[in-house]
Amino acid sequence: MSGRGKGGKGLGKGGAKRHRKVLRDNIQGITKPAIRRLARRGGVKRISGLIYEETRTVLKNFLENVIRDSVTYTEHARRKTVTAMDVVYALKRQGRTLYGFGG
């Protein structure tokens, strides 16, 4: 291993570069019925038509913030895999403590 730490990462033959599909407009995958079901769970009876796009925007911003913080924790620990604890710590940092996932 010659002093490279855990996992022996470092020099070596680089593997083939994989093509990754560019993700676009996936927020539309949060469908109108899915938003309606979430609202029903929250006790909402009637929903304005303008709510759906606004909900998608708010959800996207929330997830971007949580994922950014989670990845920061992962990079700081020099890992490549985001763990449940990274997400728990990211949520706690934003004042939304989540119980039931360790820690």
UniProtKB/Swiss-Prot annotation:
Major location category of this protein: nucleus
GO molecular function, one term: protein heterodimerization activity
UniProt DNA-binding residue ranges: 17-21
Positions of region (Disordered): 1-20
The entry's keywords: Chromosome, DNA-binding, Nucleosome core, Nucleus
SUPFAM superfamilies from the UniProt entry: Histone-fold (SSF47113)
CDD domains: HFD_H4
Ranges of biased composition (kind: Gly residues): 1-14
SMART domains found in the cross-reference section: H4
Subunit structure: The nucleosome is a histone octamer containing two molecules each of H2A, H2B, H3 and H4 assembled in one H3-H4 heterotetramer and two H2A-H2B heterodimers. The octamer wraps approximately 147 bp of DNA.
Annotated protein name in UniProt: Histone H4
Organism: Volvox carteri
Gene: H4-I
